[in-house]
Amino acid sequence: MELALITAQQVAVLFLLIGTGMVAVKTGVLKLENKQALSNLLVYIVVPAMVVNSYRMEFSAQILHNLLAAFGMSVLSVLLGTVITLLFTARKTGSRMPIFRFACIFSNAAYMGFPLISALFGSEGLLYASAYVTVFNILLWTLGYGLVSGGSSVKEVARSLVRTPVLYAIVVGLGIYLLQIPLPTLITQPLELLAGVNTPLSMLITGMLIAAGDVRSIVTDKHIWKLASVRMLLIPAATLALFGVLGFHGTAAQVVTLLECCPAAAITSVFAVQFGHDEHFAAGSVVLTTLLSIVTLPLCALIITMVM
């Protein structure tokens, strides 16, 4: 119950930050074309700094064990979501299906998940979240890229992975953690300051995305509601059930499960534009699932604390 209340409070805070982003766009303080630059700042600088900073803790064999377990649980959860999505859409065709499948499988772990995990579980939770994001990125740029591009070469996939900065941040962070490398204040202070930017910046970007969408047309689109039911209800419930059957519990399991409860990945819209898919459907999927998460995330946290 305590985790659910903290989650509800944190989601409310995130929603206020999202609202700030929406107001900033509506009043002209921020332009929609600024979204890509802010997103690049987040992905290439802020999130990597936050990941490296999260590894700055005293070595613990138990935490290392939990970290390795988090990697395994992350692989299991994302693959489970993939199987569920492919089964759900097995007999469905249409131009929206690539985006439908992608948005169901891949959650907004970085934008929505990291701020939430940081607030609920602190640095240890971020360690386990970084394990999830590592698995997430590898599958996103292989399986996910293939889903929306209609097939991709090994060279294209490798190039995409090499351009994923958070993977380098995890390697550096792991090195610092395992070798217990002391960092000077000149390095740690900028890392901490940049890490602190993650939550407000990611929520401002989410608010800008919502401001750009037509909420009325989004909430009347039955296909987006079907997508939301898979992304926000079916996959989290299946993950929770599977982890319960396998006896997974503790902070690492809670973190991975909560990340699976997050809305559709913001990059869904980017891929829709890049590969000529229905970008309004993609943006609508992100917007609706993000709005629904204001209610569903606290409920998921409540259930997680009851069974894990």
Give each language-model segment a name.
Residues 1-308:
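Alpha-helical transmembrane segments of multi-pass small-molecule/ion transporters
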